[in-house]
A protein has these predicted regions:
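Peripheral interaction segments used for macromolecular assembly
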Residues: 1-275
């Protein structure tokens, strides 16, 4: 599994279940789920439960990722939101997940005093070449959130989904998502290909941008040539690579994609008013 001592990147599976504390070190609750913005390839929001804290009962709460900071040695996340704000927050029932669009989520961000991440720059279109962002890029969520056409998908739902190529051949499945803790981006997707192309039991780090959801088929399309996959350097399930941006640059470059932090920098520099 991914190394827990790496403070910059953690797998979604590792984050899920982590404790949440306040700035005074008091236990607040835990992270129940990460909801992924499929178009932007990042954590749209974290789903927290607070147990009986402040009489908040069994409801769940959508919290902006920016409000959480990892305290590495405590294996906990610090939530820097005032008690009163949490007390008056509108939660939701575990059987009724309401936040399925950015419009709905923007109200939650505003309530907690955060600017929605998609308003900080021009959101990049990440469909495949020659395709547009439309119904094929819409997403499904877990059963509790409905499987209509929301814009977010839980990390738990993504994990285990099948991956196919353009010819519709099964390639493998998604094993994990590695999260960049700095901004909640999906640093890379971990795929297994089984016996496809003789790739054995190794795992492979794949840029999120290389995947496109086929919503009605409940699977992801991977648009990378067979030869490229065949020659890719995988890693053993018991020996995950130390993730850093230098290593990620090599991975992204191999598959022909620009690293997400470079795209972000370009968007900021190209905003109107910037010289």
């Amino acid at each position: 599994m991914a190394n827990r001592e790496n403070p910059d990147f953690l797998s979604a599976g590792t984050i899920k279940g982590d404790k949440v504390i306040n700035t005074a070190g008091e236990d607040l609750g835990k992270i129940e789920e990460l909801m992924i913005d499929i178009q932007d390839g990042r954590v749209g929001y974290a789903v927290l439960s607070f147990g009986g804290f402040l009489g908040m009962g069994d409801k769940l709460f959508a919290i902006p990722w920016q409000a959480l900071n990892l305290r590495v040695h405590d294996h906990a996340f610090v939530l820097d939101i005032p008690k009163e704000t949490l007390e008056n927050a509108k939660g939701f029932d575990k059987d009724h997940w309401p936040l399925t669009t950015r419009e709905e989520l923007s109200r939650t961000y505003t309530y907690y005093g955060y600017q929605p991440y998609w308003q900080t720059g021009v959101t990049e279109q990440i469909g495949l070449p020659g395709e547009t962002i439309g119904s094929e890029r819409m997403v499904r969520t877990e059963s509790t959130a409905g499987r209509e056409n929301p814009e977010f998908l839980s990390a738990s739902t993504i994990k285990g989904d099948k991956v196919v190529n353009r010819a519709g051949e099964d390639l493998g499945k998604i094993e994990e998502l590695m999260i960049d803790l700095q901004d909640g981006r999906i640093a890379y997707t971990v795929l297994s290909f089984g016996g496809f192309l003789g790739m054995g039991d190794k795992l492979f780090a794949i840029p999120w941008k290389a995947l496109q959801l086929r919503v009605h088929e409940h699977k992801f399309l991977l648009d990378i040539p067979k030869e490229t996959l065949k020659n890719a350097e995988g890693f053993d399930k018991d020996n995950w690579p130390i993730t850093n941006r230098e290593w990620l640059s090599t991975v992204y470059g191999y598959y022909g994609y620009q690293p997400y932090w470079q795209r972000e920098k370009e968007r900021i520099e190209n905003r109107p008013g910037n010289i």
